[in-house]
């Protein structure tokens, strides 16, 4: 294990705690320095939080003339409900999306220039449309006779015999194509309130020849508005001048994606670089455009390719033949996401889509209501695998490229260079399982993987360092395991970090990790020498608990455990200590108790060398080194390192005093207070496990009066 002088300690809950404290400050109106007025409703917030999440507020508060504003009035067309949802998202990282408020949230996000939220809303809508599309798609003849033809649907349904001059919407101004555009996302049921839909913006027309359209795959009906339209490689084809300006009738107060010509794209980008410093990143091999529909291949290839977390979520919603290059250009009035915008949120911390890990430096944000922090598993993983904490082999990425994603990506166009394996990994940071299923990764495993990397001091590979999120670990090429910690400790992984060749041990049990013939349980990190024992342990330990207590809600996997549990209700303690006479209801508790008399302390802290009698004491001690206090009080917000301390603290709010003296009838909130009272007032000996009762014969006659 690395020495304290050269180690880096990762606080896994720091980011979530800071955000939680900021939200509490906002709810108590502490240090809020701006009031946002939306349709006569006022919202108090902190400027720094608004700047960090919204491009609109970023541009306002960075302006020297507007940075001191204390009251900001937003456009009256903005929905207060949508702004309230987005404001809560800024402080909690949770976006409350429902079919009734999706349009209000998306419209407000477009106005606030929160592109990552807009993309999430669009994918939410596309997912809803994809479910309704098969039942709503009319036959070809009925569809061609309908008046609701859209440009891409015309192209998909037109016959091959249509000549090029009769192509609909070809070489027509962008404003004329508005007649074919129905309201945005018309297939989704919306609430009675009307929100600005931005359907009056011009749609890009088709600049492809008949041969190109014939060879291109047809666009699915469930995706009516593609994010980009790439130009063919024919340099003789130019973009009409009509597309170089947005529609004049658009209100300037509304945020929308501008459409630029290739000539003015360069000065616009230079202008945005003046306001926002864009960190340099790797140059992509595949260009793409999101906000600018028409861009030459040579210009787009010079744009930075930044893997965004919206594309992580997009893998759950996009069709299987979706193009790989979904990155887009940021509008001039919107900051880069690496500057002031966070990664895209997930809908729920408990959903499968939410099981993603931020590997770009910010720890995984966990719900403050969950008091469990898997620090013990993190500690065990560091201690048990301290010999294998070297850097991850860089060469293993090349061998795993064929297993990263089950999607069949289309071949790149002729004008673009073929994608290298490194670029493919950069384009698709999400690592799916080999079966394509979105399997949930335990939080403890992700914490183990993150802390192990930080303690080892090894940077990620080039493909992983630019990917903000990791959904699934790569599958081990030797033993087939997908455990997050397996990539760090598998002895079969080829690489220069291991000093000697390790024996090959294959495992057919895909849900476990193996090392030198030892099988690990991915749920609790238990070790087994045989695969059959691991399977039996998985079925018995991590399955349903059939034996339930008839007096409480406790349930158990074994009948004997239930019988032992019932002694809690009956008060029976058949196991007695031969030295001090202490009684226990379980033999394991008696065994642990005997270590007090023998002086045995088998559990050692690998950081400071302290030893403990019980493993629970070691678990609590490890939290001192990590600096974590995972148990918050829901009433006052005070955080505690131990669960028992939190339970004792809650008695302050509830007024409960469960410990009482039988002779004085005094009640105490904590057991330590009762012990002190018994020692001082009744002369009782309280350093044993014997119940703290003092007989009347042993009491001096004057002591009861003192109480």
Swiss-Prot record:
Query: What domain notes does the record hold?
Result: Interaction with corepressors through the BTB domain is needed to facilitate the rapid proliferation and survival of GC B-cells but is not involved in the T(FH) formation and BCL6-mediated suppression of T(H)2 and T(H)17 differentiation required for GC formation.
Q: Which GO terms describe its cellular component?
A: Golgi apparatus; nucleolus; nucleus; paraspeckles; replication fork
The UniProt keyword set, sorted, is: Acetylation, Activator, DNA-binding, Immunity, Inflammatory response, Metal-binding, Nucleus, Phosphoprotein, Repeat, Repressor, Transcription, Transcription regulation, Ubl conjugation, Zinc, Zinc-finger
What are the Polar residues biased-composition ranges? 331-350, 425-452
Q: Which Gene3D superfamilies match?
A: Classic Zinc Finger, Potassium Channel Kv1.1, Chain A
Tissue specificity, please? Expressed at least in germinal center B-cells of spleen.
List modified residues, type N6-acetyllysine: 380
**Where is coiled-coil annotated?**
none
- Which gene is transcribed and translated to give this protein? Bcl6
- The name this protein carries in UniProt is B-cell lymphoma 6 protein homolog
Q: Which PANTHER family match?
A: B-CELL LYMPHOMA 6 PROTEIN ISOFORM X1 (PTHR24394:SF36), ZINC FINGER PROTEIN (PTHR24394)
């Amino acid at each position: 294990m690395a020495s304290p002088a050269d180690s880096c300690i990762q606080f896994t809950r720091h980011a979530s705690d800071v955000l939680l404290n900021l939200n509490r400050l906002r709810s108590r109106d502490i240090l809020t320095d701006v009031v946002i007025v939306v349709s006569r409703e006022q919202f108090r917030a902190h400027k720094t939080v608004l700047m960090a999440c919204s491009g609109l507020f970023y541009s306002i508060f960075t302006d020297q003339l507007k940075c001191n504003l204390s009251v900001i009035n937003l456009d009256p067309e903005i929905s207060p409900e949508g702004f309230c949802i987005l404001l809560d998202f800024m402080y909690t990282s949770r976006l409350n999306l429902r079919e009734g408020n999706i349009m209000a949230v998306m419209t407000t996000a477009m106005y606030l220039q929160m592109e990552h939220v807009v993309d999430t809303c669009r994918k939410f809508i596309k997912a809803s449309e994809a479910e309704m599309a098969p039942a709503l798609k009319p036959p070809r003849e009925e569809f061609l006779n309908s008046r609701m033809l859209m440009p891409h649907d015309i192209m998909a349904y037109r016959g091959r015999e249509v000549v090029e001059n009769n192509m609909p919407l070809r070489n027509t101004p962008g404003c004329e194509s508005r007649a074919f555009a129905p309201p945005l996302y018309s297939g989704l049921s919306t609430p009675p309130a009307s929100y600005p839909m931005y359907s009056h913006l011009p749609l890009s027309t088709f600049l492809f020849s008949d041969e190109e359209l014939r060879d291109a795959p047809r666009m699915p009906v469930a995706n009516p508005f593609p994010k980009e339209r790439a130009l063919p490689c024919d340099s003789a084809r130019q973009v009409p001048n009509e597309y170089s300006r947005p529609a004049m009738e658009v209100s300037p107060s509304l945020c929308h994606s501008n459409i630029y010509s290739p000539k003015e794209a360069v000065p616009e980008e230079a202008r945005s670089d003046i306001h926002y410093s864009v960190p340099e990143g790797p140059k992509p091999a595949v260009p793409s455009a999101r906000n600018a529909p028409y861009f030459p291949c040579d210009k787009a290839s010079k744009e930075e390719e930044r893997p965004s977390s919206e594309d992580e979520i997009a893998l759950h919603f996009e069709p299987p033949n979706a193009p790989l290059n979904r990155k887009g250009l940021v509008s001039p009035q919107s900051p880069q996401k690496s500057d002031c915008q966070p990664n895209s949120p997930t809908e729920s911390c408990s959903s499968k889509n939410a099981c993603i890990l931020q590997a770009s430096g910010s720890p995984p944000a966990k719900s403050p209501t969950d008091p469990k922090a898997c620090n013990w598993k993190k500690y065990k993983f560091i201690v048990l695998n301290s010999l294998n904490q070297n850097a991850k082999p860089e060469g293993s990425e090349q061998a795993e490229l064929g297993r990263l994603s089950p999607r069949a990506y289309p071949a790149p166009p002729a004008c673009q260079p073929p994608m290298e394996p490194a670029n493919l990994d950069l384009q698709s940071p999400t690592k799916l399982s080999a079966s394509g299923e979105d399997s949930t990764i335990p939080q403890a495993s992700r914490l183990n993987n993150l802390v192990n990397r930080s303690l080892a001091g090894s940077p990620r590979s080039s493909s992983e360092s630019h990917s903000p999120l990791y959904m699934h670990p790569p599958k081990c090429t030797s033993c087939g395991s997908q455990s997050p910690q397996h990539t760090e400790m598998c002895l079969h992984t080829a690489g220069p970090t291991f000093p000697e060749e390790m024996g090959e041990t294959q495992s057919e049990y895909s849900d476990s990790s193996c090392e030198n013939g030892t099988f690990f349980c991915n749920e609790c990190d238990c070790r087994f020498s045989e695969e059959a024992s691991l399977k039996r342990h998985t079925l018995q330990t991590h399955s349903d608990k059939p034996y339930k207590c008839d007096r409480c809600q406790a349930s158990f996997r074994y009948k004997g455990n239930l019988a032992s549990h019932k002694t809690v209700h009956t008060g029976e303690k058949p196991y007695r200590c031969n030295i001090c006479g202490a009684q226990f209801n379980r033999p394991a508790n008696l065994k642990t108790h005997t270590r007090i008399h023998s002086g045995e302390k088998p559990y050692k802290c690998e950081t400071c060398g302290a030893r403990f009698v019980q493993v629970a004491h070691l678990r609590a001690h490890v939290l001192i080194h990590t600096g974590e206090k995972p148990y918050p009080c829901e009433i006052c917000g005070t955080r505690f390192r131990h669960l028992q301390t939190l339970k004792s603290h809650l008695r302050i709010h509830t007024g409960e005093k469960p410990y009482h003296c039988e002779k004085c009838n005094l009640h105490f909130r904590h057991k330590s207070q009762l012990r002190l009272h018994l020692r001082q007032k009744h002369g009782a000996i309280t350093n044993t496990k014997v119940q703290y009762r003092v007989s009347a014969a042993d009491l001096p006659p004057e002591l009861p009066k003192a109480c």
